[in-house]
Amino acid sequence: MSENLTGRIIKQISGYYDIAVNGTTYRTRGRGSLRNDKITPLVGDFAAFQPGEGDDEGYLLKVLPRHNALVRPPVANVDQAVLITSAVEPDFSKNLLDRFLVYLEGHDIHAEIYLTKTDLTKPQRLTKIRQDLAGYTKIGYPVFAPDKPFDPTILAQVQASFADKLTIFTGQTGAGKSTLLNHLVPGLD
């Protein structure tokens, strides 16, 4: 019987949990005791588990205490969020941006702001949006507002900001989350 290990859940599907430890991924199933104790493991959870032998999956034994947890998406122990907001289609909204930031701060999640669709708005409107975003920079939020869409220099700064951190990408529907992710990680499914 193998020794128990501790790692982070990186994927959950149909009762299976993939747990990463030092670059190795182990497939596990939750023990019945988790269900009996009404514990639902989430992606991002740190967990104790018993690795499987050969091709057999192991067993997730215990979910360790969480720093934070979100319902949508269901994820735990989030270090930071990249909050995507668009200049247009949908229109920029300080009110909505504030609501997202309050939600993230309430869950002790560091936020960074990324402005998309800067090429689709009028220059005067973009100037006003950038003035609004400067206020967020003044209170400590990193803001990425590229002049041209998906500027490689800005993308490199965003990538550097989430190295070695569990980062979620969030924002209103249509703001460009998937498009940004596909530019950050080409070939992402």
Residue spans for each PLM region:
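Residue-level signal for inorganic ion chemistry
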Residues: 44, 104, 116
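Short flexible coil/turn linkers enriched for glycine and charged/polar residues
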Residues: 3, 11-13, 107, 137-139, ...
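Catalytic P-loop NTPase motifs of RecA-like helicase/translocase cores
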Residues: 91, 121, 187
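Canonical P-loop GTPase G-domain recognition
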Residues: 120-175
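N-terminal accessory targeting/assembly segments
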Residues: 1-94
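Conserved beta-strand/loop subsegment of P-loop NTPase cores
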Residues: 78-85, 107-118, 140-145
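A conserved segment at the C-terminal end of the G1
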Residues: 178-189
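Histidine-anchored nucleotide/phosphate-binding helix
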Residues: 95-110
